Amino acid sequence: QPKSTPTLTVFPPSSEELKENKATLVCLISNFSPSGVTVAWKANGTPITQGVDTSNPTKEGNKFMASSFLHLTSDQWRSHNSFTCQVTHEGDTVEKSLSPAECL
């Protein structure tokens, strides 16, 4: 089975959620094979380990997909310039960043 590097999409928190002082970022990891991935989140380049919830990969056709959630408060979300979802797969690292300023 050919190796396939994951595609990442990062979604910002919803405005409804921010009103409740919560912020959940979602990193969608898709189209990868084989199934082993390691997900790390960073805020302004610094690793975040708390509030991270990553699903087990599920098979979609002959590829896999997974998602990782980063649970923050709205203050944490607003107080950083960038959030990055970093995925390591078969020795390759792919990352996708999201900037709160672009989401206002």
Curated annotation (Swiss-Prot):
PANTHER family: IG-LIKE DOMAIN-CONTAINING PROTEIN (PTHR19944:SF98), MHC CLASS II-RELATED (PTHR19944). One of its GO terms (cellular component) is plasma membrane. Residues 6-99 form the Ig-like domain. Transmembrane segments: none annotated. The keyword Disulfide bond applies. The keyword Disulfide bond applies. This is Ig lambda-2 chain C region. Keywords: Disulfide bond, Immunoglobulin domain. Pfam families: C1-set. Disulfide bonds join 27-85.
